[in-house]
Amino acid sequence: MFDLPKIEKAVKMILEAIGEDPNREGLEETPARVARMYQEIFAGLGEDPEEHLGKTFSEEHEEMVIVKDIRLFSMCEHHLIPFIGKAHVCYIPRNGNVTGLSKLARLVNGYARRPQLQERLTKQIADAIMKRLNPYGVVVVVEAEHLCMSMRGVRSPGARTVTSAVRGIFKKNEASRAEAMSLIMKS
């Protein structure tokens, strides 16, 4: 799927365009390293993250399940600069249909490892859980620092963006949503 020689050629052209010598010591292997790095950090493009939710377990549990602080990194599709943060995922299983906790982390990372927008990432995670697990409801909160804001433009290091996606009972029931959000945001 990845055209590594094409990526190498593009990186070499960028180095030349900024006035660097891509053949000098220290840079001569950079195009190949960047190509391999892109293959790794964009690995989510070659998978369907929803498939991680394919295996479920029957468990008599119809209360909140929350996995907090799922570390993530992604690449802002506007600047191809990383955003780094964490996702918090909460759902209420329906009919005891639960998934493995690690599957939620795999889902998050599958969607994060591609050119992405934080808003879309948050929505994709919530929608995949609703589709594959059919829970009573889902809340997803993503907090991240965007290096495109930290390193360039406004240059505001440490600023965090928080996005949320709320589905099912959490959208309809204010008390349930408030409980989920308080548990998610509690340190």
UniProtKB/Swiss-Prot annotation:
Pathway: Cofactor biosynthesis; 7,8-dihydroneopterin triphosphate biosynthesis; 7,8-dihydroneopterin triphosphate from GTP: step 1/1. The keyword Zinc applies. Homomer. It is an enzyme of class 3 (hydrolase). InterPro entries: GTP-CH-I_C/QueF, GTP-CH-I_N, GTP_CycHdrlase_I, GTP_CycHdrlase_I_CS, GTP_CycHdrlase_I_dom. The gene is folE. The lineage of its organism: Bacteria, Bacillati, Bacillota, Clostridia, Eubacteriales. Keywords: GTP-binding, Hydrolase, Metal-binding, Nucleotide-binding, One-carbon metabolism, Zinc. Its EC number is 3.5.4.16. Belongs to the GTP cyclohydrolase I family. NCBIfam families: folE (TIGR00063), PRK09347.1-2 (NF006825), PRK09347.1-3 (NF006826). Zn(2+) binds at C76, H79, C148. This is GTP cyclohydrolase 1. It catalyses: GTP + H2O = 7,8-dihydroneopterin 3'-triphosphate + formate + H(+). SUPFAM superfamilies: Tetrahydrobiopterin biosynthesis enzymes-like. GO terms for cellular component: cytoplasm. One of its GO terms (molecular function) is zinc ion binding. GO terms for biological process: one-carbon metabolic process; tetrahydrobiopterin biosynthetic process; tetrahydrofolate biosynthetic process.
